[in-house]
A protein has these predicted regions:
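Double-stranded RNA-binding/processing signature
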Residues: 1-310
Length: 310
């Protein structure tokens, strides 16, 4: 791994290592260490597996749980300030299972573009191990293990990294149309064949709004509005590049995950305004009435609707 590779990986996961050797170790398979000596990523994977479980449970508790004292109708004299949750244990277990299952972690690694950096021995190379979901799952967990060790088990940094790598909003958001991170991922895949490139920085909107920026930046000129107050309270910013012929976007948030969500919304709204969104018409080379039946069959095969039965 060279400095450029390390910089790219750190940008994608939103964490800068003090000890970049730990980051590289997260990518080393046992097959490589067996042939060349040194350590591999297996213990880091074990650590990361436990980190992932803990952070996902915390995310679910933060989103769906509450103490009754937070409710408007809470009566401190007659009610107990107990912990409650919108979902029962079985439902929470089901959601957690969806988030941490092998295929989901493998998909996240693909969307981050990290599998190609795996350091493998000859046996793994022959078997194309970097294409196997279980190997990508191991890599996901090993990266979290490396972050845990490097950060001194810093809970905030671990949660930031899990949120950025796992994209839990993809599973937790009820309205897919509001999941701008997933929508930008899909746009990049269809339009450029590449992944969106993120770069995270610590810094508030308040400290940077007046500085020149060669791109499209999240902004709000309505003083005192909820959106303005959120911007002023931001502590992180995220830069996003989706294509060479499209400006760089910049968003802000109280967390890296929120900044990413805001910059993706900004980018998606720009694409919509500038007629750059992929629509159903893009699926057909030459939409016309004469070939309507055949073109409807094409769209049905691509999942836009189901064919009628007669």
């Amino acid at each position: 791994m060279d400095a450029k590779d390390i910089s790219f990986i750190q940008d994608q996961i939103g964490y800068n290592f003090k000890n970049t050797d730990l980051l590289q170790q997260a990518f080393v398979r046992r097959s490589y260490s067996h042939e060349n000596g040194g350590e591999n990523n297996e213990v880091l994977e074990f650590i990361g597996d436990k980190v992932l479980d803990f952070i996902v449970v915390k995310l679910l508790s933060d989103k769906f749980g509450y103490t009754k004292g937070e409710l408007d109708d809470f009566d401190s004299e007659n009610d107990w300030d107990e912990y409650a949750c919108d979902y029962c244990e079985n439902k929470l277990t089901e959601i957690k299972k969806q988030l941490v299952q092998k295929q989901n972690l493998a998909t996240c690694i693909d969307e981050l573009g990290l599998a190609e950096y795996l350091i493998m021995g000859k046996s793994d190379q022959k078997q194309h191990a970097d294409e196997q979901p279980s190997v990508k799952e191991d890599l996901f967990e090993a990266i979290l293990g490396a972050v845990a060790i490097d950060s001194g088990w810093n809970l905030e940094k671990l949660q930031d990294t899990v949120e950025l790598m796992l994209k839990p909003e993809t599973t937790l958001e009820e309205d897919d149309e509001d999941n701008y991170v997933a929508l930008i991922q899909e746009w990049c895949s269809k339009e450029t064949g590449n992944i969106p490139l993120y770069h995270f920085e610590e810094g508030s909107y308040q400290a940077t709004w007046y500085m020149p920026f060669d791109g499209i930046s999240q902004n709000c000129n309505v003083l005192g509005s909820p959106e303005y107050n959120k911007l002023m309270a931001s502590t992180h910013r995220c830069l996003l590049k989706i294509a060479d012929d499209i400006p760089i976007f910049r968003g802000f948030g109280k967390s890296k995950s929120e900044a990413r969500k805001n910059v993706c919304r900004l980018a998606y709204e720009w694409l919509d305004k500038n007629d750059r969104l992929h629509t159903i018409r893009n699926e057909l080379e030459n939409p016309n009435r004469n070939e309507a039946i055949g073109q409807l069959e094409i769209l049905a095969r691509r999942g836009y609707f189901t064919l009628p039965t007669y």
